[in-house]
Every structure is written in C-alpha cells, then in structure tokens.
Amino acid sequence: MTDLKASSLRALKLMDLTTLNDDDTDEKVIALCHQAKTPVGNTAAICIYPRFIPIARKTLKEQGTPEIRIATVTNFPHGNDDIEIALAETRAAIAYGADEVDVVFPYRALMAGNEQVGFDLVKACKEACAAANVLLKVIIETGELKDEALIRKASEISIKAGADFIKTSTGKVAVNATPESARIMMEVIRDMGVEKIVGFKPAGGVRTAEDAQKYLAIADELFGADWADARHYRFGASSLLASLLKALGHGDGKSASSY
C-alpha cells in the first residue's frame, strides 16, 4: 500500500462526514448516512444539525452501522458569548440524542480581551455533556483569531474548561483549517501534557487526500504514529471523502459538497 493510500484509509476512518447547510433536508442527511458507510470502512461520525439527529440515528441503524457516531453543533456558527443560550442548545442537542457536540467558543469575546466567558461557556457545556456521556469538541475559529497567541490562548482555555477535542473552524468563515493553525493547536495539547485525554479536529478546507496526509503527518511528528485514532483525531469535512475514496481506488474523486 502506498503512503497516500495508507494515510487515506486512516483519514477516512477519522472523518466526521459533515453537512451543515441552510438547505439541509432529511433526504440529504439520509444520503450522508449512506455515504458514511464506504466499501473500505466507515467514517468515525457524521456531523449534522440537531434536528436531523433522529432520522440519522434511524438510518444508521437500518443500514447496519449503528457504531457511526452522531455529532452536532451548538452556539453555531457565530460563537456568541451568551452562556445560557449555548448551554440550552447543548442540552437540546443531547436530548435529540447526539453522541458528540461541537460548540463554538466565544472567540470575539476573547479577541476583545475577555478570557473568562470562554472558560465559563465551555465548562457549562462540558458539565452537561459529561453527565450524558457525550463528547465535547470546542471550535475556536482560528481563521478569525488569526494571531498565534490568541489561537494558543483559546486552545488553552478550552482544554482547562474540559474540552475533549479542540477544533479549528466552523467552515463558515473565509479562512478555516490551515496546517499552521493545526500545528499550533496540537503543540498546545503537547505542551499541556494532555494528549492522552484531548483530541484535535481540523475542519473546513481539508479537501484532498494530500491535504489529509499533511495534517496527519503533523500529528505523527508531535505524538507518534499511534496517537491519531478516532478518540484523538477527527477531520471535519465532506468533499474530502470522495478524494480519499479515489486515492483508495473507489470512485472518481468528485463530490457534491465543498465543506
């Protein structure tokens, strides 16, 4: 197996196959569930809006892949600093049956100098998730933070407040995941000594098998080749799947989605 094939198979099994569009429908989510079951293995999860969780759960069970996890988003995509709303949305997502919640960190508040609200928001959402055995990923929106010190600070605050994963981006802003921001975030995980319990998720802009290979190489360099498993690493993407399948000899690499 070539290096690209090997990394593509790894990446496919680490995907949170995503649809977060305003025009999402039950039919589109059902199609996403079908796509998550591939000839070479399943994606780790799907990521959808909360209202579609019941139909996704039913579809995944019917197609014989109940182990594919269901992730959803809260405080999304704006990352406002209203803790009560973020918490209410997170509790609602859990009630819908989410296995994982990707909450947006109040990044604009941090840019304005308020570190406390981010900590408090993540901590509140973590308490709700932990009580239900739900994984919490925190989206820090690196493309808006821009500055390395802010990316580092948002990562540190999220981890201290209990994040199970730190995630680069919503996919809804001009700049999403980059290898540079990925390295900074994973270095924070390393420097804080939390690599056993905190994972990393690049999202938005990871579109090709070659892109995925680059991101995995950074993880391997920092943590060794065994670290990036589904408990410690995810790719938030949709169009990436077609590219990975093509690299693995399935399909033409074309995708209907741009995330």
Swiss-Prot record:
Pathway: Carbohydrate degradation; 2-deoxy-D-ribose 1-phosphate degradation; D-glyceraldehyde 3-phosphate and acetaldehyde from 2-deoxy-alpha-D-ribose 1-phosphate: step 2/2. SUPFAM superfamilies: Aldolase. Gene3D superfamilies: Aldolase class I. It catalyses: 2-deoxy-D-ribose 5-phosphate = D-glyceraldehyde 3-phosphate + acetaldehyde. It comes from the Bacteria. Keywords: Cytoplasm, Lyase, Schiff base. Its EC number is 4.1.2.4. The active site is at 102 (proton donor/acceptor), 167 (schiff-base intermediate with acetaldehyde), 201 (proton donor/acceptor). The keyword Metal-binding does not apply. GO terms for biological process: 2-deoxyribose 1-phosphate catabolic process; carbohydrate catabolic process; deoxyribonucleotide catabolic process. One of its GO terms (cellular component) is cytoplasm. Catalyzes a reversible aldol reaction between acetaldehyde and D-glyceraldehyde 3-phosphate to generate 2-deoxy-D-ribose 5-phosphate. Belongs to the DeoC/FbaB aldolase family. DeoC type 2 subfamily. This is Deoxyribose-phosphate aldolase. The gene is deoC.
